[in-house]
Swiss-Prot record:
Record GO terms (molecular function): sulfotransferase activity
Organism phylogeny: Eukaryota, Metazoa, Ecdysozoa, Arthropoda, Hexapoda
Name of the top EC class for this enzyme: transferase
Record-annotated active site: H165
Name the UniProt record assigns to this protein: Luciferin sulfotransferase
Annotated keywords: Transferase
Reactions this protein catalyses: firefly D-luciferin + 3'-phosphoadenylyl sulfate = firefly D-sulfoluciferin + adenosine 3',5'-bisphosphate + H(+); firefly L-luciferin + 3'-phosphoadenylyl sulfate = firefly L-sulfoluciferin + adenosine 3',5'-bisphosphate + H(+)
Recorded superkingdom: Eukaryota
Keyword Zinc (UniProt): no
Applications: LST may find use as a new tool to modulate existing biotechnological applications of the firefly bioluminescent system.
The encoding gene: LST
SUPFAM superfamilies found in the cross-reference section: P-loop containing nucleoside triphosphate hydrolases
Note: Both D- and L-luciferin stereoisomers are found within the firefly. L-luciferin is the likely biosynthetic precursor to D-luciferin, though D-luciferin is the major stereoisomer by static abundance.
InterPro entries with a match to the protein in the record: P-loop_NTPase, Sulfotransferase_dom
Source organism (scientific name): Photinus pyralis
Length: 370
């Protein structure tokens, strides 16, 4: 699939960056020295992201392109008026973004026809792949909100809506030191569903070639892009009591979307137009979202298929259900995930939460409210 492209450049050449691996503190390359490293080097790397690195004490796994933007991210000027939707990939991010944007913009459905990536830019998107190399090799350009997302956000006026998959400790320092207090809405989801969805997303959007068995191994090794699921969740969870942080779950959104809408509106200090609530619920339904080109990423899928960059055809929004993993995971793998979850949350306050029982397939049958 990638033979014609891989032949044009050295497979694992180091991309030049402002911060070399030697200069950066606590940055390690993911070496091709064990089973996980072999899978990553064989099935995850390509000319546009040709190395993974582990960043910081938590060893968050990111593409090497991140190092080019590390300082810009750290020193990015945050505003108190910013609204951030943060999540681990495939935890319900797009759904939450659209909900938050519409509430924040007084249910302006006409304005929501503009592409979500432009209205609600992905902060670190420019770090995920080397867009300069992509333009050079494929001859296609990307709009600034994709190819230079940090600069695009920096120049936006008014309230900025920002998406990120970065761990809490990699957010701009003005958030970490408390000098700025933007609204942060974090959404999480059963990690088993996240893994299945991330697998299909990776093949459809990223061009990853791993089969599900090998993908699951990398996911559980916590060397998948954006690192450990539970370190990610617990990093934000620790800040849940701050007045500028709201924690949502995908499962609660599926069970009672209206209550999540009202809770989010209250958090954002926005008054809802009750007459437009039915339209909002319809707009946020799975079928509507799946067929909405402003949010369904169909343009990206078509572009990647055109250039033969992805090994799988499909839709960005696949099932829109909870516990979909049961149709794709073996009982053995489900047990492995649950043991990993128990170990990962042990000793944290999260372990006493009802949602933890739901994620562990225990006696908790109903979806708890956060």
């Amino acid at each position: 699939m990638f033979a014609s492209i891989l032949g044009k450049i050295p497979q694992y050449s180091t991309i030049s960056s402002k911060c070399s691996l030697k200069e950066c503190r606590k940055v390690k390359k993911v070496e091709n020295s064990d089973e996980i490293g072999e899978i990553i080097h064989r099935d995850f790397l390509d000319p546009f992201c040709n190395e993974y690195v582990l960043i910081g004490e938590e060893e968050t796994s990111l593409g090497i392109n991140y190092l080019q933007f590390e300082e810009e991210i750290r020193t990015f000027e945050i505003r108190d008026s910013d609204i951030i939707v943060a999540s681990y990939p495939k935890a319900g991010t797009t759904w939450t973004q659209e909900l938050v944007w519409l509430i924040g913009n007084d249910l302006d459905f006409k304005a929501a026809e503009e592409h979500l990536d432009k209205r609600f830019p992905h902060f670190e998107l420019c770090t995920i792949v080397n867009f300069a190399k992509m333009t050079e090799m494929l001859g296609s350009t990307r709009p600034e909100y994709i190819g230079n997302s940090i600069n695009y956000l920096r120049d936006l006026e008014g309230t900025r809506f920002i998406k990120t998959h970065l761990t809490y400790n990699l957010l701009p320092e003005q958030i970490l030191n408390g000098n700025r207090k933007p609204k942060i809405i974090y959404v999480m989801r059963d990690p088993k569903d996240v893994c299945v969805s991330y697998y299909h997303h990776g093949r459809l959007i990223q061009g990853w070639r791993a089969d599900f068995q090998n993908f699951s191994k990398v996911f559980l090794s916590e060397k998948i892009m954006f690192g450990s699921y539970w370190k990610h969740v617990l990093g934000y969870w620790e800040h849940r009591d701050k007045p500028n942080v709201l924690i949502l779950t995908y499962e609660e959104m599926k069970k009672d979307l209206l209550s999540v809408i009202r809770k989010t509106a209250q958090f954002l200090d926005k008054k809802l137009n009750e007459n437009k609530i039915p339209q909002l619920l319809k707009h946020l339904s799975f079928e509507s979202m799946k067929n909405n080109r402003a949010v369904n990423q169909q343009d990206k899928i078509e572009s990647r298929m055109k250039h033969k960059l992805v090994p799988e055809q499909g839709a960005f929004m696949r099932s829109g259900t909870s516990q979909n993993y049961k149709g794709e995971m073996s009982e053995e793998l489900i047990l492995k995930f649950d043991e990993w979850t128990k170990k990962s949350i042990s000793g944290s306050s999260f372990v006493t939460e009802p949602i933890a029982d739901l994620y562990l397939n225990t006696s908790q049958k109903s979806v708890p409210k956060m």
